Amino acid sequence: MLEALFRDSVEEAINDSIKEGVVLAVYNTARDDQWLKSWFKGDDVSLDTLAEHSIWLRLVKDTEQFQLFEQVFPNVVVPSIYLIRAGKIELIIQGEDDRHWEKLLACIGIKDKKAGESSSRETNPGLAREEKSSRDVHRKNARERIAETTLEIQRREQLKQRKLAEEERERIIRLVRADRAERKALDETHHRTLDDDKPLDVHDYIKDAQKLHSSKCVLQIRMTDGKTLKHEFNSSETLNDVRKWVDVNRTDGDCPYSFHRGIPRVTFKDSDELKTLETLELTPRSALLLKPLETQNSGLSVTGMEGPSLLGRLYKGFSTWWHNDKDPEVTSQREETSKPNRHEVRSSTPLSGAASSSCFQYNNVREPVQSSAHASPMLTPSGTRYPSETNLTTSRSVSPNVFQFVNNDHQEDPEDPTTFNGNNVHLEKKKDEDKK
């Protein structure tokens, strides 16, 4: 019943209130109409009469419209009715009071008009009929306005839905067109690839063929000690000419080597050294490495055969004192053996089982080195009984001069030989003689 009294549009209610000059009744509620129904007497005055003399608006708490109203009129009490005329508050109805209905009618102006109507009816019955017909017209007009407002709201909602549907349809059409264009472009690209029989041009940007035929060749050569040499050669010169220049200017010794290139990784052979630098694709500039050659004699070497070591000299003095009277031949043999020899050592034939190690024979086997490309001969083991004998000098690098002595006396008694293996001294025989 009360729902037909309230307007739906806030703007429309405010505009009609200002235009007609009537009171704007703003009903503030918290979604519960019990307070209004407790004192509202709809039987005394019809809703059409209230709608004719005032415009009613309903605001629910915590809504956007209620918050806007609270900004204009702060400290709004819920539930309450604000009666506003020309932008000013004339009356606020709130709380529990039996006179709310009379105050409302008095502020709206219906009370005075009702009294005048009662007196006119008594004096003039025809006027009463006219007023009744006019009230019917106003009641009809109020219903029509409510119906028109409802239809307007429905029409706006339909237009909004229609607009959204049209926008969605346009979006789908754009997506379909974009998909068709993409498919068409892919098909054209595929057919163009299949129909194109022209071979693709392959460009090699790694090296320029014209620069490979330059007349000069700059080589940067890294020696075995990490230092570098840089020189400019003619492209017609061979790699052997480069070797000769390196042999003259190198500072890392005279070890044999071969040329090695990092990119592309190539180790040049002896046959490649007869080719020109242009043929080997070293022009216009390249970097070479000196790679030391590994020979079969590089595993065994004798270092510093300049003189007897400290242990050798001590043993020489001790053995001279020991065998001075009994064994002069052994002493002379040891003195001959301890003489310095600067030549490479080759192992002799194995001795008998009584000897703890083999003896070495010194031979002059050095040959002159003609070029750095050939490895010089080095010490090679031969005829050794034990594998550890080949590493004799490397295992004792602290004492560079290692000699082995063999006593020839008392060969008829192999159980107790008098030998020196470079590590310890056998003194058992000397002790036995002292006891005697």
From Swiss-Prot:
SUPFAM superfamilies: Ubiquitin-like (SSF54236). Present with 2190 molecules/cell in log phase SD medium. The keyword Phosphoprotein applies. The gene is UBX7. The keyword Acetylation does not apply. CDD domains: UBX. This is UBX domain-containing protein 7. Keywords: Endoplasmic reticulum, Isopeptide bond, Phosphoprotein, Ubl conjugation, Ubl conjugation pathway.
